[in-house]
Amino acid sequence: MRKITMRHSRTSILQRAALAFGLLTTSVVPTAVAPSEIEYYTFPSIYGGTIDTKQWQGKPYLVVNTASQCAFTKQYASLQKLYDKYREAGFGMVAVPSDDFNQEFDSDAEVKSFCELNYDIDMPMSETLSVRGQDAHQFFKAVKTESGFAPKWNFNKILIGVDGTVIDTWGSLTRPLSAKLTKAIEDELSKSQ
C-alpha cells in the first residue's frame, strides 16, 4: 500500500495554498518495486545523442522538469551546484525542459542557449519533453504508475535510489540545496559505496 505523509501535522496557510497549486508535494513512500521497472530510461539529449540512466546503475539520480520562463527558473543555478557537489560520487541528474505548463521556449536551441548563457549549465539536459498526461515521457509515466506522482508544476524533483525505485519527490518550493533533498541524496550515496 502506498502511503502519502506530511512531515508536520500542522501546515501553514502558505504551505496549504502551495500544495493546492502543485508547488509543494508530499513525500511519497513507494512500496517495494522491482528495480527494472523504473531504473533504466533514455532521454534525447539537448546536446545531441541520448542520456541513458543506466550509467547511474547502483547510484542515485535526480530528474527535474524545468522551464526557462518560470518564476522558479533561478533554481537552475542551484541545480548545477547540486550536480557539481555530488557528481564525483556518482550522483546523476537530468534536467527535463517541458512546455506542459506553457513556460518554455519554442525550440531546444533557445532552451540550450538560455541555460548556457544565464546559468553556465553543463548537467545532463534532455530535449523539451512532456512530463505529464498521455504524452508524457516513459520515465514520468513509470514514476506515476509506481508512486502516484506526476509533476504539478515546473521544477518538481524526483529522486531515484540506488535500487532504481522512487525514493522521494519534491515540489517547486523545495530548493535544490535544501537540507531534506541533500540528506536524501547523501543517504542514497552512502548505500552505493
Annotated model-derived regions:
Residues 141, 146-193:
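Thiol-/selenol-based redox modules, centered on thioredoxin-like
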Residues 16-27:
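Bacterial N-terminal signal peptides
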Residues 59, 66-69, 97-100:
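Short pre-active-site segment immediately N-terminal to redox-active cysteine/selenocysteine motifs
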Residues 25-37:
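Bacterial Sec-dependent signal peptides at the C-terminal "C-region" and cleavage site
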Residues 72-136:
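Structural microenvironment flanking redox-active thiols in thiol-disulfide oxidoreductases
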Residues 41-60, 83-86:
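A short beta-strand-turn-helix
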